[in-house]
Amino acid sequence: MTASETVAFVDKMKPNRFSVEEKFRWLTDIDGMIVRELIDTHEDSPLDAPFAGYIPGRDDDTELIAPAPYDSLYRWYLEAQIDLGNMEIAKYNNSKGLFNQAYLTYTDHYNRTHMPRQRGGFRFSERRKGGEHDALSSRT
C-alpha cells in the first residue's frame, strides 16, 4: 500500500480535520520505528536506501515498508493518532489496541523470516594460576 492510498483510505473510513502533511508525518514516525526496531537489527534489509521519511507530493506513490497482509498497522496507527488528537480517549484505546496487535503480528513475521544481526561475540576466557581462577587466587 502506498502512502497516499493509506491516507485516502483512513480519510474515507474516519473523516477528520487533520492535514495530509500531518498524516504523512505519522506514517514517517511508524516506518521510522519499523526501521530502527526491526530492519536495522536484522540482516538482509529490504530497503534500497536509508529511510528518509515521507513528504506529500514527493512520496505519494511510495510503498510503505510493511507489506500486505501486515499493512493494516498503518490504518490503525493513523486512526489512533486522529483519536488522540480529538481527545477521544476510548476510541484511541481501541485503535491503539488494534495497532499494537497488527504491529506485533508484523514484528513476529519479520523476526521469523530474517536473521538477527550478529553484533560482536562473546568471548569467555579463563586464565588460571595454580589451578584456580585469577579472581579466586587474588583473595588472601
Positions of predicted regions on the chain:
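Structural motif
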Residues: E63-L73
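Short helix-capping/linker segments at secondary-structure and domain boundaries
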Residues: I82-Y92
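Short, charged, amphipathic alpha-helical segments
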Residues: F24-R25, N93-G97
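Generic detector of ordered secondary-structure context
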Residues: E22, Y70-D71, K91
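Short, hydrophobic/amphipathic alpha-helical patches that form generic packing surfaces
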Residues: S72-L84
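Short, surface-exposed beta-strand/strand-loop-strand elements in extracellular ectodomains
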Residues: A90, G97-L98, A102
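Conserved short "hinge" loops at termini or chain/domain junctions
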Residues: M1-E63, Q101-T140
